Amino acid sequence: MAIKVFQHFLCICLFSLAIPLPSHASQSKPKAENTTSFDFIKHLEGGRKGQKVKGLQQLKTYLQEFGYINYSPNKTRANDDDFDDSLEAAVKTYQFNYHLKTTGTLDAQTVSQMTAPRCGVPDISNGTNWMQVGKNVPSHTQNAIHTVSHFSFFKGNPKWPSTRDRLTYAFAPGTSSDAISAVAKAFNTWASQTQFRFSQSQNFVSADFKIGFYIGDHGDGAPFAGPNGALAHSFAPPDGRLHYNGDQSFSVNPIAGSFHLETVALHEIGHLLGLQHSSVQDAIMWPSIPAATIKGLHAEDIQGFNNSPDVEPIRFSSYVFQCNV
């Protein structure tokens, strides 16, 4: 889909303690029935159509959260543990998006990808598989794509108008200085490749982008599920909210067991600017990222931005880097 221009910076990986990041959520506890931790999927390996396996109902919830399946309200199939036709089609679409063999079964590779840390924004929304826009989609995935849920994210595919090229961002009270610095660097990186200019504001209420760390059910309709769920999520223009999962471990430097603050910010800012997920694994808009990994902008990310309506083409000139500990 994109021209793969991939250059490597020399990454100097400095080891340090993970940052203790405060949570700025309400005091409400996480609601188990509304959250999806990914570890349960490990116990479903080997599942296939026709089987009844305890936990498949949770998998249906997982796939519905990320846009792969939708059961109408008058159907009970969403609340059972049957591996039905709709679930098989959803698994095939997921496998296709993540460059896996489209078996429709929960093989080891599929389970490994499904349990990987990822962004909480859906891959498919409003009936569109954003990871495959402009590509020929195999017929076995068509039904799943046409039966996806509609989410509050990216409804109508909104973009910031060309007249709004100077935007402000602010942090929830108590956000650490290290986190603020990392997110600011990510905004600067996007500014270097787009027409946007970003500046930090001290007014959290009036800022265009509002960044904070939250736990559990924090009032935005997309509760976090603890340390084994989504890393972060953000909302499309002009909403501007970017929420890190406060139960995850984040750090300024790539250390084992922690997620790189700036890399996660680069991804989520892409959503704030209107970008969807990419099927190019090297792109910052690829939905998942391992711990202790640094990524930068990729040509695919810039191409995606240039293909957005009301945006003047931007020349891609920065280096792209990736570093794993």
What are these language model-derived features?
Residues A2-V325:
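Zinc-dependent metalloendopeptidases
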